[in-house]
């Protein structure tokens, strides 16, 4: 059996190529500890961020997730109610509550001056997390549409041996 996940590669390409957001030496806060986060932590570690912190409603799940990547960088975990006072450069939302009408009022004690917020969820309207982020001083925000497109291109490359161009697809879908 051969299996691939394109969550990490799709996210990285969207962050770095489409959005121009660097993550090397960044403090990254991940909200949620589900399957999508499992798929992206490894890829984020490869970019050598300063730190990655996973915060989840169920604290034990956050710790279980970072244990999978021990020795891959500075990884810490907590509940959503105990996020460290670190100047977060990038906050990535993977909470299932983001699919609902509102986003939970999570206290993020410190943001970097140029903090960015990224929602793994995508929509033709601002997601609940993007609206929440806009109201809390994030300088840049994006939903996960670019990640979805980049994942599709990576999957196509796995099956067909060549990676299709994605910039035009993303531009068309954003208009």
Which functions belong to the PLM regions below?
Residues 47-69:
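NAD(P)-binding Rossmann-fold cofactor-contacting core
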Residues 8, 102, 107, 115-166, ...:
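Rossmann-fold NAD(P)-binding glycine/threonine-rich loop
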Residues 21-27, 48, 112-113:
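Short helix-loop-beta connector
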Residues 58, 82-104, 118:
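Rossmann-like NAD(P)-binding element
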Residues 37-38, 126:
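N-terminal Rossmann-fold NAD(P) dinucleotide-binding loop
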Residues 32-34:
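Glycine-rich Rossmann-fold phosphate-binding loop(s) that bind the pyrophosphate
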Residues 1-26:
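Glycine/small-residue-rich loop that forms an oxyanion/phosphate-binding "nest" at active or ligand-binding sites
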Residues 45-51, 135-140:
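Conserved S-adenosyl-L-methionine
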């Amino acid at each position: 059996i051969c299996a691939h996940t394109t969550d990490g590669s799709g996210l990285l390409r969207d962050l770095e190529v489409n959005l121009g957001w660097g993550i090397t030496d960044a403090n990254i806060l991940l909200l949620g500890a589900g399957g999508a986060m499992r798929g992206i932590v490894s890829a984020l570690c490869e970019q050598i961020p300063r730190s990655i912190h996973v915060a989840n409603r169920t604290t034990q799940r956050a710790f279980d997730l970072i244990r999978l990547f021990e020795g891959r960088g500075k990884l810490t975990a907590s509940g959503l109610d105990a996020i460290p006072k670190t100047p977060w450069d990038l906050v990535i939302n993977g909470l299932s509550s983001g699919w609902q009408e509102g986003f939970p009022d999570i206290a993020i004690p410190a943001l970097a001056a140029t903090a960015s917020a990224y929602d793994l969820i995508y929509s033709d309207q601002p997601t609940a997390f993007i609206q929440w982020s806009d109201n809390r001083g994030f300088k840049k925000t994006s939903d996960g549409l670019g990640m979805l497109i980049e994942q599709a291109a990576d999957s196509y490359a796995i099956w067909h041996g060549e990676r299709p161009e994605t910039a035009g697809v993303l531009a068309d879908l954003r208009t």
